[in-house]
Curated annotation (Swiss-Prot):
GO cellular component, one term: membrane
Modified residues (N-acetylserine): S2
Phosphotyrosine modifications at: Y467, Y580
Site positions per UniProt: Arginine finger: R151
Disruption phenotype: Double knockouts for KBTBD2 and PIK3R1 have increased body weight, normal fat storage, blood glucose and insulin levels.
PTM comment, free text: Polyubiquitinated in T-cells by CBLB; which does not promote proteasomal degradation but impairs association with CD28 and CD3Z upon T-cell activation.
GO biological process: B cell differentiation; cellular response to insulin stimulus; cellular response to UV; extrinsic apoptotic signaling pathway via death domain receptors; growth hormone receptor signaling pathway; insulin receptor signaling pathway; insulin-like growth factor receptor signaling pathway; interleukin-18-mediated signaling pathway
Residues of the Rho-GAP domain: 113-301
Name recorded for this polypeptide: Phosphatidylinositol 3-kinase regulatory subunit alpha
Family recorded in the similarity comment: Belongs to the PI3K p85 subunit family.
Oligomer status and interactors: Heterodimer of a regulatory subunit PIK3R1 and a p110 catalytic subunit (PIK3CA, PIK3CB or PIK3CD). Interacts (via SH2 domains) with CCDC88A/GIV (tyrosine-phosphorylated form); the interaction enables recruitment of PIK3R1 to the EGFR receptor, enhancing PI3K activity and cell migration. Interacts with XBP1 isoform 2; the interaction is direct and induces translocation of XBP1 isoform 2 into the nucleus in a ER stress- and/or insulin-dependent but PI3K-independent manner. Interacts with PIK3R2; the interaction is dissociated in an insulin-dependent manner.
PTM-bearing positions, type Phosphoserine: S154, S279, S608
SMART domains, alphabetized: RhoGAP (SM00324), SH2 (SM00252), SH3 (SM00326)
Length: 724
């Protein structure tokens, strides 16, 4: 269900004056429901003139706040369909390469390649990524009048500096670092972004504007309009504006640093655009476009207009119809004992205010963790329990977790932490997770299982192929970096030899001239030319290798992008396949039939049939249910047993059970939840009507879907194995 609405962009900063207002930051995107304007008596067409409307009530998509804002502070963008907030598909995300023990330059090159996209590095009210701000402030402080800035390459490795800043940017003292190293790190930062600051989608229009318009004033206005929202992403626009301010400041000191707008545009257009296989004409037009933008003053802002008169609003009494007496187990937002990784997956790319509650990782009875989406990141808040009361911090005042959560669904968490100015708006419901299976008969579900499993296998093969290529390319890059270092050392040795030869040759040439020995003179000159020629050959070889390395590094980044674009699909396909498989298992479908749909007739894997269900010792609960045993006794019983040997015991957590199983020669423990929907290791898998039903399912299904370190099935009941 969606409604019609309008979008506006903030032109000025506004600090709220009343409780019902919301803050505005330059560039914020706001949405207003059409119905709210109709209710105020405004007709179609007037939405495009917000300054005539006065105060509008809407939703700030950038900050996640809803309230009133002045129409004189915004501009109209266009119409938009407004839908209730739903989780978005997971976009590709670059993953950092695991650091190795060796700190060679090749390793540094590899580790410094991945960078998060701009949208993941910062969010308004920040005007640019913190790392970028720190670099440019240091460059402007140390090198504003430097005559070689951005044109002299430093001897240090900028990747090492960027990696250091990435880890702990606040603690690094840039005063001690040479300005050319900082400049190289800045250029490297722009080059390593997964996507260019200026998106490819606007290249053609920028070139046309730079080529066709004769008046610089007209061109500036149209270019400014082109590079604003919604043509480019919000973070890209803010970052580009920050860069242009930096370039403008440098160009104002061009009499000393020799960096006018033209020179700066030539230096930075390749990393701002990354236009592949561009003709020289296209490149020239893009350089001209950047030159025009740099020449424009970006620091000055027009003063904000006067606020429109604001009518008094009637006060409303908040109606809290939420049930504080509800059991925690029945709350849709309570997920029990799930891992932090699963929580991150469920909250990925959701709106600010999305939340869920799980058991605290400390496993202390009564302690829980609230995970809340704020500013595009997950915020973890501990819920403490003491003397029958709950809360985030002392004094604990709430009678239950449900009462605590319901309170903050109406009130901002700024009461607890000023930086968390958001309400608990959108619960992640555990009851909506099982609606994946839409078909209503077993045969239709089986066909869909076969379809999803086939897609999963194809994606897996594609990912494996890319991973092999990724690994091979990484190794080749390291080898080429090592070879370039060897070339550098060789060139250094030859140049020293050449200098030595020149120094001594002068004396001998003078001597042989006096003696009239032309033959010896020719021999000395020939040897010198031969040495020079050899140096040139080595330098050419190094240059070709550097070009190959540059191309291969681009390929490496492209492979990494493709892998990250496939990974979300792979994860989603696996989850969907497993949900279909679980649905069929719950309906009592035999393993033989499942294997046919999965294509496992002749292949043994986690879904293969080991032995007929009727013959399994698992049917006798006495072989694995040891009652009220503790962790130490369980470990003693399982010590020395083969992988897959297990038992089930009562847990120290009231109302739950624990499964102890041997994995890779070690005994591991995991909680079995008992909920209103059934037994299970985690939501949404708490579906089994009895412990026996759960044990029979995981006899042929690996626990790895719940925990990466538990790649094992419940194969051998502890007492059944002893009786054998």
């Amino acid at each position: 269900m969606s409604a019609e609405g309008y979008q506006y962009r903030a032109l000025y900063d506004y600090k709220k004056e009343r409780e019902e207002d919301i803050d505005l930051h330059l560039g914020d995107i706001l949405t207003v429901n059409k119905g709210s304007l109709v209710a105020l008596g405004f007709s179609d067409g007037q939405e495009a003139r917000p300054e005539d409307i006065g105060w509008l009530n809407g939703y700030n998509e950038t900050t996640g706040e809803r309230g009133d804002f002045p129409g004189t502070y915004v501009e109209y963008i266009g119409r938009k369909r407004i839908s209730p907030p739903t989780p978005k598909p997971r976009p590709p995300r670059p993953l950092p390469v695991a650091p190795g023990s060796s700190k060679t330059e090749a390793d540094t090159e590899q580790q410094a390649l991945p960078l998060p996209d701009l949208a993941e590095q910062f969010a308004p009210p920040d005007v640019a990524p913190p790392l970028l701000i720190k670099l440019l402030e240091a460059i402007e402080k140390k090198g504003l009048e430097c005559s070689t800035l951005y044109r002299t390459q430093s001897s240090s490795n900028p990747a090492e500096l960027r990696q250091l800043l990435d880890c702990d940017a606040a603690s690094v003292d840039l005063e001690m670092i040479d300005v050319h190293v900082l400049a190289d790190a800045f250029k490297r930062y722009l080059a390593d972004l997964p996507n260019p600051v200026i998106p490819v989608a606007v290249y053609n229009e920028m070139m046309s504007l730079a080529q066709e318009l004769q008046s610089p004033e007209d061109c500036i206005q149209l270019l400014k309009k082109l590079i604003r929202l919604p043509n480019i992403p919000h973070q890209c626009w803010l970052t580009l504006q920050y860069l242009l301010k930096h370039f403008f400041k440098l160009s104002q000191a061009s009499s000393k640093n020799l960096l006018n707008a033209r020179v700066l545009s030539e230096i930075f257009s390749p990393v701002l655009f990354r236009f592949p296989a561009a003709s020289s004409d296209n490149t020239e037009h893009l350089i001209k476009a950047i030159e025009i933008l740099i020449s424009t003053e970006w620091n000055e802002r027009q003063p904000a207009p006067a606020l429109p008169p604001k009518p008094p609003k009637p006060t409303t009494v908040a109606n809290n119809s939420m049930n504080n007496n509800m059991s925690l187990q029945d709350a849709e937002w309570y997920w029990g004992d799930i891992s932090r990784e699963e929580v991150n997956e469920k909250l990925r790319d959701t709106a600010d205010g999305t939340f869920l509650v799980r058991d605290a990782s400390t496993k202390m009875h009564g302690d829980y963790t609230l995970t809340l989406r704020k500013g595009g990141n997950n915020k973890l808040i501990k819920i403490f329990h003491r003397d029958g009361k709950y809360g985030f911090s002392d004094p604990l005042t709430f009678n239950s977790v449900v009462e605590l959560i319901n309170h903050y669904r109406n009130e901002s968490l700024a009461q607890y932490n000023p930086k968390l100015d958001v309400k608990l708006l959108y619960p992640v419901s555990k009851y909506q997770q099982d609606q994946v299976v839409k078909e209503d008969n077993i045969e239709a579900v089986g066909k869909k299982l076969h379809e999803y499993n086939t897609q999963f296998q194809e994606k897996s093969r594609e990912y494996d192929r890319l991973y092999e290529e990724y690994t091979r390319t990484s190794q080749e890059i390291q080898m080429k970096r090592t070879a370039i270092e060897a070339f550098n050392e060789t060139i250094k040795i030859f140049e020293e030899q050449c200098q030595t030869q020149e120094r001594y040759s002068k004396e001998y040439i003078e001597k042989f001239k006096r003696e009239g020995n032309e033959k010896e003179i020719q021999r000395i000159m020939h040897n010198h030319d031969k040495l020079k020629s050899r140096i040139s050959e080595i330098i050419d070889s190094r240059r070709r290798l550097e070009e190959d390395l540059k191309k291969q590094a681009a390929e490496y980044r492209e492979i990494d992008k493709r892998m990250n674009s496939i990974k979300p699909d792979l994860i989603q396909l696996r989850k969907t396949r497993d949900q279909y498989l679980m649905w069929l298992t719950q309906k009592g479908v035999r393993q033989k039939k499942l294997n046919e749909w999965l294509g496992n007739e002749n292949t043994e894997d986690q879904y293969s049939l080991v032995e007929d269900d009727e013959d399994l010792p698992h049917h006798d609960e006495k072989t694995w249910n040891v009652g009220s045993s503790n962790r130490n006794k369980a470990e003693n019983l399982l010590r020395g047993k083969r992988d897959g040997t297990f038992l089930v015991r009562e847990s120290s957590k009231q109302g739950c059970y624990a499964c102890s199983v041997v994995v890779d020669g070690e005994v591991k423990h995991c909680v079995i939840n008992k909920t209103a929907t059934g037994y299970g290791f985690a939501e949404p898998y708490n579906l089994y009507s009895s412990l026996k039903e759960l044990v029979l399912h995981y006899q042929h299904t690996s626990l790895v879907q719940h925990n990466d370190s538990l790649n094992v099935t419940l194969a051998y009941p502890v007492y059944a194995q002893q009786r054998r």
